[in-house]
């Protein structure tokens, strides 16, 4: 068939709080769901949700988290970009004016994607409300922003705190090695 049948719903909520004359706290929540039906088992790849990257959980590379507890291995499915049918993302960021149009930022991000159905490569990605909070990837970090008026140039250094899959470590901070828990992003 030349087309895929699916319904995609997504919402975005942003709230700003002025903390000081030059400091602002920004809260952001983004959630979405895709339901494929008819001739499509999955929505087209470019419509699917993903987590990680400059506009998501900045401690991780783009499409490197999820779905659910899925962790790629050296199996025949290790090439799969990690996308899902359900997305939940939340960010909290403090922005402080440094000088002129230059701002510093401190952020905390959390999120993941899930599938609505089991897939042949993994059943660990299917959404389960009882495991929701344990399956959120969490990261923190710092950044620099330069406000050009029409757009903002930014660089963020993210540090992973928690991944949703089993790493052999217990607790909130379950990253095996600190050097594997960092990501640098440039965005406009």
Predicted segment positions?
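Repeated loop/turn-to-beta-strand initiation elements of outer-membrane beta-barrel proteins
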Residues: 20-25, 100-104, 146-155
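Outer-membrane beta-barrel "beta-signal"
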Residues: 144-149, 176-188
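Flexible, small/polar- and glycine-enriched "cap/hinge" segments at structural transition points
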Residues: 109-111, 116, 141, 145, ...
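Strand-loop-strand
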Residues: 122-148
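Residue-level signature of outer-membrane beta-barrel architecture
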Residues: 15-17, 94-96, 146-148, 159, ...
């Amino acid at each position: 068939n030349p087309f895929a049948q699916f319904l995609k719903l997504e919402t975005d909520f942003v709230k700003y709080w002025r903390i000081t004359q030059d400091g602002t706290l920004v809260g952001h929540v983004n959630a979405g769901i895709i339901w494929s039906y008819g001739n499509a088992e999955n929505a087209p790849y470019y419509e699917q949700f993903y987590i990680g990257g400059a506009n998501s959980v900045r401690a991780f590379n783009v499409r490197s988290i999820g779905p659910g507890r899925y962790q790629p291995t050296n199996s025949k499915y290790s090439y799969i970009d990690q996308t899902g049918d359900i997305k939940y993302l939340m960010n909290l960021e403090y922005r402080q004016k440094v000088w002129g149009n230059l701002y510093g930022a401190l952020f905390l991000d959390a999120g993941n994607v899930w599938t609505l159905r089991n897939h042949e490569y993994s059943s660990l990605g299917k959404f389960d409300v009882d495991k929701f909070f344990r399956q959120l990837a969490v990261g923190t970090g710092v950044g620099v922003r330069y406000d050009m008026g029409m757009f903002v140039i930014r660089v963020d250094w993210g540090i992973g705190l928690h991944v949703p899959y089993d790493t052999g470590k217990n607790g909130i901070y379950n990253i095996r090695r600190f050097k594997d828990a960092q990501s640098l992003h440039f965005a406009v």
